[in-house]
Regions:
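Low-complexity, Gly/Ser/Thr/Pro-rich intrinsically disordered linker/tail segments
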Residues: 154-174
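N-terminal capping segments
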Residues: 1-65, 69, 74, 173
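Surface-exposed beta-strand edges and their flanking turn/coil or helix-capping segments
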Residues: 40, 127, 150-154, 172-174
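Residues that form or immediately flank small-molecule/cofactor binding pockets and catalytic motifs
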Residues: 30, 142, 165
């Protein structure tokens, strides 16, 4: 991750990594539980609108923004962080500021689309770089049916935002 990454960022990334391969994708899936949520894996009806899976029965898990919220809550060990990180991709976008790729750090959020996408977006967390300098992201992917790690650009992430709750000063403010 690098030597200049704050402890808060490392804790959020560590929490995010703890779910890789363990939690399935569930449209509208959220959790503010500190630790593993006992409801993960139980069969639930997808009640959120806007997906082909809406109305179907699936193993409960997280969607992309729910994963980001859970990782932040668990990184800080504070359920109150839900308000700071936001609910849903559009809220998470709004609660984060612009940061250039050169100034981005592990722990910053990445989005596939800009603000015009509203809630029709996808979000992940930057977690490091490849040997060739490309960003790596951890995210909860519907196409991979769960939490996965991979090259950010290959996963169509194009926008980087610094969450306002980080106390470092490398991001340009909106």
């Amino acid at each position: 991750m690098g030597d200049n990454v704050s402890e808060d960022r490392v804790d959020v990334i560590t929490a995010a990594y703890s779910l890789v391969g363990k939690v399935g994708y569930f449209w509208g899936g959220k959790s503010t539980v500190i630790g593993e949520d006992p409801s993960w894996g139980s069969v639930e009806k997808v009640s959120a609108d806007g997906s082909r899976s809406s109305g179907t029965l699936r193993a409960y898990g997280l969607d992309c923004s729910g994963f980001v919220t859970w990782a932040v809550i668990n990184g800080y060990k504070d359920q109150g962080m839900q308000a700071a990180v936001g609910d849903g991709t559009s809220d998470q976008w709004e609660k984060a500021g612009v940061v250039s790729e050169a100034d981005a750090q592990p722990g910053d959020l990445v989005f596939q689309r800009g603000p015009e996408a509203g809630s029709n977006n996808h979000v992940g967390i930057l977690c490091g770089k490849t040997d060739s300098g490309d960003w790596i992201a951890v995210h909860c992917s519907s196409s991979k049916n769960g939490v996965t790690v991979g090259e950010a650009y290959s996963a169509s992430f194009r926008y980087i935002r610094k969450p306002s709750f980080y106390q470092d000063t490398t991001a340009e403010e909106n």
